[in-house]
UniProtKB/Swiss-Prot annotation:
Species name: Rhodopseudomonas palustris (strain BisA53)
Molecular functions (GO terms): ribosome binding
Annotated SUPFAM superfamilies: PRC-barrel domain, Translation proteins
InterPro entries assigned: PRC_barrel-like_sf (IPR011033), PRC_RimM (IPR056792), RimM (IPR011961), RimM_N (IPR002676), RimM_N_sf (IPR036976), Transl_B-barrel_sf (IPR009000)
UniProt protein name: Ribosome maturation factor RimM
UniProt subcellular location: Cytoplasm
Similarity remark: Belongs to the RimM family.
Keywords, alphabetical: Chaperone, Cytoplasm, Ribosome biogenesis, rRNA processing
Quaternary structure annotation from Swiss-Prot or TrEMBL: Binds ribosomal protein uS19.
Amino acid sequence: MATKRICVARIGAPHGVRGALKLWPFTEDPLAVLDYGPLTTQDGSRRFEVETAREAKDHLVATLKGVASRDDAVRLNGIELYIDRDQLPETDEGEYYHADLIGLAAVTAAGEPLGKVAAIHNFGAGDIIEIAPPSGPTLLLPFTNAVVPTVDLEGGRVVIEMPGEIEGDTPNHPEA
């Protein structure tokens, strides 16, 4: 089986005229991209070594080995940078990498299929799990122990306890 590749950053626009560029990390610690060694494109055909990086607002300003001019940096804009999954540290109990969850089957506690995990989002108020059913609109649910009581990575599934308001229950407040 091929090693799973994880996208850890995306190269952005140039920063200045000496080859520095914006780097958008997808890691919990933005500077962790320095710890993974050479980063590659998804197919592994191109390698990039981050020489320096500093935090700037919501991204990093980085220099890559061999990128010496603004023109060099412009040509890299939009490239996603990957590492092998086994380079990531082990997670604690009850913690998961988004990449390990995406693609898992989503089922009810009774085993009825709901779809597949399409994404994990965080818009500032906690993690949201996005479930893509075979047809119809996607479901966006809070990624909490109450709604997602079971994550079975080896079994390839998550169990979803649908909140009442999602199932179409009537509100518990009287009409005015």
